Amino acid sequence: RIITGFYAGRTHSIIENRDCALGVTRNKEVLDRVIAHMEKFHIQPYDENTGKGLVRHVLIRYGFFTDEMMVCLIINGEKLPGEEALVKSLCQIPETVSVMVNVNKKRNNVILGEKVRLLWGQPYITDKIGEISYQISPLSFFQVNPYQTGRLYGKALEYAQLSGNETVWDLYCGIGTISLFLAQK
């Protein structure tokens, strides 16, 4: 049986759930379509204990300021059966601008592999923090709530009292959202 959900704390046991409180309402529709596709094409979910199965994860990225959505399936192989049918199904969701596959054939519990293949659309979505737009790929680290991130960065900018002559080091920065935000000053 195919389930979606979250890892229980400090385990690799999955707590079944399709409604992420941090996510957007479209997440459930995406997951329903992916599961229907897996069932139609007899695609097995990945089993971390055996290393068998194809679909490891479904990564959904959503641009809160642009309403752009990316769906990326992380797979334990090179090709997903029925890729064209999956693209057709996911593109019925109006916000979809990108459908991708990420290949992770390593027997580990790391989510993403290094190889990304675009099935349809753009290789990224765009979102904003403050007045700065960012192009976000499946491999990008980006905050899950850009509204609150913008407010938090605004406070940091206020407290930093920058004159514009400082050098900011954004260590472990993901895609550099903090330093780019502070560079406004």
Segments and roles (model prediction):
Residues 1-185:
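Accessory RNA-recognition modules of RNA-modification enzymes
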